[in-house]
Amino acid sequence: MIFIDACFRKETPYTPIWMMRQAGRYLSEYQESRKKAGSFLELCKNSDLATEVTLQPVEILGVDAAILFSDILVVPLEMGLNLEFIPKKGPHFLETITDLKSVESLKVGAYKQLNYVYDTISQTRQKLSKEKALIGFCGSPWTLATYMIEGEGSKSYAKSKKMLYSEPEVLKALLEKLSLELIEYLSLQIQAGVNAVMIFDSWASALEKEAYLEFSWDYLKKISKELKKRYAHIPVILFPKGIGAYLDSIDGEFDVFGVDWGTPLEVAKKILGDKYVLHGNLEPTRLYDKNALEEGVEKILKVMGNQGHIFNLGHGMLPDLPRENAKYLVQLVHAKTRR
């Protein structure tokens, strides 16, 4: 698989590409599948439809990897927090974590309840071409914890950060509990058939450097170390969004580092490029305009050259991006990097 070879810095015939949120609302096929499911959460839980949605971008765009269609919040959901998705607002937990007692009341072994995810993986792997990789994923302990404490997305993360500074032992108990679940969750994804795993630390930038390293990065290192110990042949990709200023403190046992669009690739390459393959980082809104898209691709390829790079966006696809431009991006990257 070209994608897996690239994760391990092996020679590839061209630079592989996939896109975060490549299965999404910009595809009419996705809209139809979601309509059939009835809701976003039901789509995640319906393995047949989730498989359909996982495969769509590979078939339509020609990307080199599929990423499992699911949501990071299925883990806290199965740990006992009731979850709803409110239209135009996003996820909302009906109960939140407020103290040690509420951390202790969370169910252990939630990963055993996620058979709908593992079924989606095995179905997708059966239908996916042998040349294409399937990526599994989860959210980072810190990012999941913010949703569980705030109850929803947040601009300030005030409740989470208040807990971090005033009751760090409570937050650490939650992060530890989540880490143990996530190690087993990703292990079962691997056993079900994914070829690589990715951990999204979407709210990494909410923390100052020292707090980030202690309350997020340390847990990412713990998870990736255990996964590499168990499955050395499976690439681990970490994507901590918005920590470009902290790159000099990044270390650990993983293979690929996801660079967001706010971090110049030349900076990431200088600091991390010898240790890790880099993944990213086209500004997603460049896909609105072909000229802007071409300019962005040129800039990235000039910095990254032929090895140590997987092409991706620096964040997720937006719902109204023109699909023809997404397809063009894949063709352009393949053509420009063919060696």
UniProtKB/Swiss-Prot annotation:
Its main location: cytoplasm. GO terms for biological process: protoporphyrinogen IX biosynthetic process from glutamate. It is found in: Cytoplasm. The record marks D71 as: Transition state stabilizer. Pathway: Porphyrin-containing compound metabolism; protoporphyrin-IX biosynthesis; coproporphyrinogen-III from 5-aminolevulinate: step 4/4. It is an enzyme of class 4 (lyase). GO terms for cellular component: cytosol. GO terms for molecular function: uroporphyrinogen decarboxylase activity. Substrate binds at R21, Q22, A23, G24, R25, D71, Y147, S202, H315. Homodimer. Catalyzes the decarboxylation of four acetate groups of uroporphyrinogen-III to yield coproporphyrinogen-III. This is Uroporphyrinogen decarboxylase. The lineage of its organism: Bacteria, Pseudomonadati, Campylobacterota, Epsilonproteobacteria, Campylobacterales.
